[in-house]
């Protein structure tokens, strides 16, 4: 699927580690090189999210058709029976623009993409300073029930065990520093 020279940047992390904040900064700093790869999901939109911008929001039935038709580069059932996936059409759309897809993705999905495109991807794991800080960040969002917060923290602990399978680990204790480190890693990869 990836033609010679087509690269992919994977930013993965437990929920609340700061990957989306880092991705937004990267897109602001590198608009000529990177384009956001819009994933599809069966979860409901959060306040302020727009279909086709943050995600393509779809039904479970439609998502399962995409799986059956081979339309997804990767997919996972992530939280509480909600699907997330990367449409092949998104990667192709971005490559046609002459840019590199930037994936804001969960840990298992990130590893699937990395394993599917081992020679053309850079997989970065954004590590939170601690599970306590991660809990504070998730609670501050105001979108979690006590049950979903516990589930996300348990999943985060599990996901942290996969961090060494990524090309690089970026510790996000300070957002500006983490963004600068991530941007430099990407610039080096794209120039190689």
Model-derived features: where do they sit?
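Conserved lysine of the Walker
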Residues: 19
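Walker A (P-loop) phosphate-binding loop of P-loop NTPases
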Residues: 16
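Post-Walker A helix-loop "phosphate-sensing" segment adjacent to the P-loop in P-loop NTPases
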Residues: 28-36
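Conserved phosphate-donor/acceptor-positioning beta-strand/loop module used by diverse small-molecule
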Residues: 101-106, 117-140
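Hydrophobic anchor at the beta1->P-loop junction of P-loop NTPases
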Residues: 11
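ATP-dependent small-molecule kinase phosphotransfer cores
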Residues: 39-101, 108-111
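NTP-dependent small-molecule kinase module
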Residues: 2, 136-144, 158-192
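Post-Walker A alpha-helix
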Residues: 22-24
């Amino acid at each position: 699927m990836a033609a010679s020279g087509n690269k992919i940047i994977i930013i993965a992390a437990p929920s609340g580690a700061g990957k989306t904040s880092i991705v937004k900064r990267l897109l602001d700093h590198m608009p000529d090189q990177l384009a956001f790869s819009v994933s599809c999901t069966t979860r409901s939109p959060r306040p302020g999210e727009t279909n086709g911008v943050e995600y393509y929001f779809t039904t479970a039935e439609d998502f399962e058709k995409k799986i059956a038709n081979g339309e997804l580069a990767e997919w996972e059932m992530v939280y509480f029976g909600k699907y997330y996936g990367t449409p092949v059409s998104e990667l192709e759309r971005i490559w046609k623009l002459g840019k590199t897809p930037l994936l804001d993705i969960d840990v298992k999905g990130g590893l699937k993409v990395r394993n599917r495109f081992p020679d053309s991807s850079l997989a970065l794991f954004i590590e939170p300073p601690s599970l306590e800080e991660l809990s504070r960040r998730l609670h501050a969002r105001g979108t979690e029930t006590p049950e979903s917060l516990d589930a996300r923290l348990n999943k985060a602990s599990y996901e942290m065990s996969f961090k060494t399978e990524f090309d690089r680990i970026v510790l996000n204790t300070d957002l500006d520093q983490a963004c600068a480190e991530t941007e430099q890693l990407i610039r080096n990869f794209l120039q190689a």
